[in-house]
Each structure stands twice: as structure tokens, then as C-alpha cells.
Amino acid sequence: MATDKVIPMTRPEDRHVHAEHDGKVDNQTVHVSKSAGHQVTWFSARKAVIAFSSPSGSPFEETIFHVPAGGSVSSGPAKPTAEAEKHYKYSVVGEKGVNDPTVIIHN
């Protein structure tokens, strides 16, 4: 009898951030290790947009991430050019507000 392999949606080493409808998050500052291959996974019960639009840009390949209602989206690993110990501000745009948390990259 064949069995389906269950693949987890996130990895244990992912950094999880839950966004609310007002843009607030449960993890205001996220620490990401390039050498460990950490990723950020954003979750939201409602639609949300994650946007790295500050002059520092994004530490990830993409600058905008769309979180579907009731779903999640992952950043992928930090790009090689992401600066260590740098604070990357981003905006979380929820249906009823905006918040500006931070991702900090470590080697």
C-alpha cells in the first residue's frame, strides 16, 4: 500500500511571523542567519503584503511578498549580498493598518 509523504510547509529553522489585520506582528524583530540558511515565513488569517521598500532594500531576492488569507509565504534564504548586522525595515500592510518591523541579518 502506497503512503503519501507529508512535507511540512515550513522548516524548523524558519523564523515565523504572524501578521494581524492591522499590520501588527507577533515578532517585531526577526534575526536571520545566512550561514544557517534561515528564512522568514509570514502567516496571516487575512491577506497581507510584506514590502521591503526602505533605502536599505531587501535582504532577500524578492522585495514584495503577498500572504494569502489563511496562508503563508516564505522569504527564501538571505541573498549573498545581504549585509551582516544590518537592520532591514519592512512594512506589513494589513486590511486595517500598516506596521514597520525589522529583519536583522547575521553571518
Question: What do the PLM-derived regions correspond to, one by one?
Answer:
Residues 4-39:
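N-terminal edge beta-strand
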Residues 56-61:
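Short, solvent-exposed loop/linker segments at beta-strand-coil boundaries, enriched for Pro/Gly
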Residues 1:
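Extracellular cell-wall/glycan-interacting regions and their flexible linkers
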Residues 43-49:
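Short proline/glycine-enriched turn/loop motifs at strand-loop junctions of beta-rich domains
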Residues 30, 62-66:
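Beta-strand-rich interaction surfaces with strong enrichment in secreted/lumenal proteins
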Residues 65-107:
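Extracellular/periplasmic metallocenter environments
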Residues 50-54:
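Short, hydrophobic/aromatic beta-strand segments
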Residues 36-38, 46, 71:
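Surface-exposed loop/turn positions
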